[in-house]
């Protein structure tokens, strides 16, 4: 998992935005990818 502050999310490698269809409500940038949350949408 990854963290956006204290929020746990799912790390997506080599993406700069969250993939659709998972119900993500937000994200933050991480090294070589993006962290999308919530972790269990």
UniProtKB/Swiss-Prot annotation:
<comment type="similarity">
    <text>Belongs to the sea anemone type 3 (BDS) potassium channel toxin family.</text>
</comment>
<keyword id="KW-1015">Disulfide bond</keyword>
<dbReference type="GO" id="GO:0042151">
    <property type="term" value="C:nematocyst"/>
</dbReference>
<keyword id="KW-1220">Voltage-gated potassium channel impairing toxin</keyword>
<keyword id="KW-0528">Neurotoxin</keyword>
<keyword id="KW-0166">Nematocyst</keyword>
<dbReference type="Pfam" id="PF07936">
    <property type="entry name" value="Defensin_4"/>
</dbReference>
<dbReference type="GO" id="GO:0005576">
    <property type="term" value="C:extracellular region"/>
</dbReference>
<keyword id="KW-0964">Secreted</keyword>
<keyword id="KW-0800">Toxin</keyword>
<keyword id="KW-0872">Ion channel impairing toxin</keyword>
<dbReference type="GO" id="GO:0015459">
    <property type="term" value="F:potassium channel regulator activity"/>
</dbReference>
<keyword id="KW-0632">Potassium channel impairing toxin</keyword>
<feature type="disulfide bond">
    <location>
        <begin position="18"/>
        <end position="36"/>
    </location>
</feature>
<feature type="disulfide bond">
    <location>
        <begin position="4"/>
        <end position="28"/>
    </location>
</feature>
<dbReference type="GO" id="GO:0008200">
    <property type="term" value="F:ion channel inhibitor activity"/>
</dbReference>
<keyword id="KW-0165">Cleavage on pair of basic residues</keyword>
<protein>
    <recommendedName>
        <fullName>U-AITX-Bg1a</fullName>
    </recommendedName>
</protein>
<comment type="function">
    <text>Potently and selectively inhibits voltage-gated potassium channels Kv11/KCNH/ERG. Acts as a gating-modifier toxin that shifts the voltage-dependence of ERG activation in the positive direction and suppresses its current amplitudes elicited by strong depolarizing pulses that maximally activate the channels.</text>
</comment>
<feature type="disulfide bond">
    <location>
        <begin position="2"/>
        <end position="35"/>
    </location>
</feature>
<dbReference type="GO" id="GO:0090729">
    <property type="term" value="F:toxin activity"/>
</dbReference>
<dbReference type="InterPro" id="IPR023355">
    <property type="entry name" value="Myo_ane_neurotoxin_sf"/>
</dbReference>
<dbReference type="InterPro" id="IPR012414">
    <property type="entry name" value="BDS_K_chnl_tox"/>
</dbReference>
């Amino acid at each position: 998992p990854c963290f956006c502050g204290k929020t746990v999310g799912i790390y997506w490698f080599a993406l700069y935005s969250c993939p659709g269809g998972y119900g993500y409500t937000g994200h933050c940038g991480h090294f070589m990818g993006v962290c999308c949350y919530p972790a269990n949408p």
